């Protein structure tokens, strides 16, 4: 669910994971049964704004098929990994519900929200780019696309642009935009 995912957000992290098909059911069970409750606890206690587990539909990458989005008001909240302790929250040892052994690839990126229009939606398109002029790209999105979408979302229910804060290397994107829709 993408609804309101970035409401009041200033920062977000995306954890990309590659889960082999034979591990998907157990991965989804552990994430939706246990880790979603840890995230809910963090949201209710003001440690983050939102959490989402999404699966990829189509696309050109074979390096990930699931992603976690954690949304925060501050960079300090985003950096505080101590809040992800299922032992203190659920009374369950982290090793009992770990999904690390079910994945064959993992990567985390951290982002700053530069502009967004809130709304609901069950599906999203993520666009990753590495523009030659990052500042101009963000400025164009803030001053041209944001106001244009405020007038006519063109079927979108949510839109935004974020700047990457880590993994800034030649082969990686430095910016992403997202467009949410009611369904795929």
Per-segment meaning from a language model:
Residues 1-11:
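Bacterial Sec-dependent N-terminal signal peptides
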Residues 9-184:
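Short S/T/G/P-rich N-terminal loop/turn motif that feeds into the first structured element of a domain
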């Amino acid at each position: 669910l993408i609804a309101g995912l970035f409401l009041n957000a200033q920062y977000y992290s995306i954890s990309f994971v590659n889960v082999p098909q034979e591990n998907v059911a157990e991965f989804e069970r552990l994430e939706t049964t246990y880790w979603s409750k840890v995230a809910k606890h963090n949201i209710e206690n003001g440690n983050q704004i939102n959490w989402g587990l999404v699966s990829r539909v189509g696309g050109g990458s074979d390096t990930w098929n699931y992603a976690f989005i954690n949304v925060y008001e501050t960079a300090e909240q985003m950096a505080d990994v101590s809040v992800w302790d299922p032992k203190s929250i659920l009374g369950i040892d982290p090793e009992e519900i770990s999904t690390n052994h079910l994945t064959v690839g993992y990567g985390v990126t951290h982002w700053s929200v530069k502009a967004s229009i809130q709304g609901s939606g069950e599906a999203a398109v993520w666009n990753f780019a590495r523009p030659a002029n990052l500042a101009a790209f963000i400025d164009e999105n803030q001053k041209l696309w944001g106001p244009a979408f405020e007038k006519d979302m063109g079927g979108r229910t949510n839109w935004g642009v974020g700047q990457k804060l880590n993994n800034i290397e030649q082969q990686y994107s430095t910016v992403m935009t997202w467009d949410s829709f009611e369904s795929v």
